[in-house]
A protein has these predicted regions:
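First exposed extracellular module after export/assembly in secreted or surface-exposed proteins
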Residues: 25-143
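Positively charged n-region of N-terminal signal peptides that target proteins for export
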Residues: 1-4
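C-terminal motif of bacterial Sec signal peptides marking the signal peptidase cleavage site
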Residues: 13-16
Length: 143
């Protein structure tokens, strides 16, 4: 009897610890990249998924490209806004955002070496709630 009670209590506690899928602050997750090695004349497409309880996603997605320092002091890193398409407002909204860059947008500045970059993403909604930071896997940008 005691074991049954403890087992039931454990199941109840574990089921109560589930994180809500839809929250007031947008949730942003990195899903994938179309390539992990970007060469000349190619396009990099990074796919993110989002959820938002109020459905008030604004067009504010901030993208950070982070590259280790080059011997010449330049690193090719940047912080820039990325325009998110308009979504019709709906409760418990979810979807994907695809961020695309051509080779010339992110080309390596550490010549003659290849760059290895990671991309970080932050989404803000119309009520100024900010998502957690989503981080890509390392992307090699060839020279």
């Amino acid at each position: 009897m005691r074991k049954t009670f403890l087992f039931s209590l454990l199941i109840l506690l574990l089921s109560g610890c589930k994180k809500d899928k839809f929250t007031t602050a947008p949730q942003l997750k990195y899903k994938s990249a179309n390539t992990t090695t970007l060469g000349r004349f190619q396009t990099l497409s990074l796919t993110l998924s989002f959820t938002d309880a109020e459905g008030d996603i604004a067009n504010t997605l901030t993208v950070l490209k982070i590259v280790k320092r080059c011997p010449n002091g330049s690193d090719g890193s940047f912080v820039q806004p990325y325009t998110v398409p308009s979504f019709p407002a709906a409760k418990n909204q979810q979807g994907d955002i695809i961020v695309s860059y051509s080779y010339n947008d992110v080309n390596p500045l550490c010549s003659p070496r290849n760059d290895t970059a990671i991309f970080k993403f932050v989404l803000k909604d119309k009520a100024d709630h900010i998502s957690d930071t989503a981080v890509s896997q390392p992307i090699i940008i060839t020279n």
